[in-house]
Amino acid sequence: MKKSILLALPFLFFAAKLHSYKLENLEKLQTTGACAKCDLSGANFYEADLQEVNLNGAILHHANLRRSNLSGADLSSAMLFRADLFGADLTNANLEDAKFCNTILPLGSISVKDC
């Protein structure tokens, strides 16, 4: 039992690092409405009002954007690998050069376009 826990620890640590973001990046987004090229991997934006935010080039791997309002947001060149956009409003959002790999899209399909 003890041996299996010790063997699992490196994997748990690695997984935690994949889903972490710097708190100052989240605070920057909340206060300024912009966080271009920020790493917000694993952030929970469930039902968040993110209208017209600037997330140009942001890293949003594993981010929960479910039912969030991203209308008019700049997501150009953003990386959204394994992000969840189910029910999100992307009306007039700039998605130019955004990367979606195993991302749940607003209507529930999974994008494998950029994998």
Which residue ranges define each predicted feature?
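Ankyrin-repeat-protein effector appendages
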Residues: 8-10, 114
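Positively charged n-region of N-terminal signal peptides that target proteins for export
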Residues: 1-4
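Cleavable N-terminal signal peptides
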Residues: 7-8, 18
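Tandem repeat scaffolds
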Residues: 19-115
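Short amphipathic alpha-helical "recognition" segments used for binding
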Residues: 6-7, 28
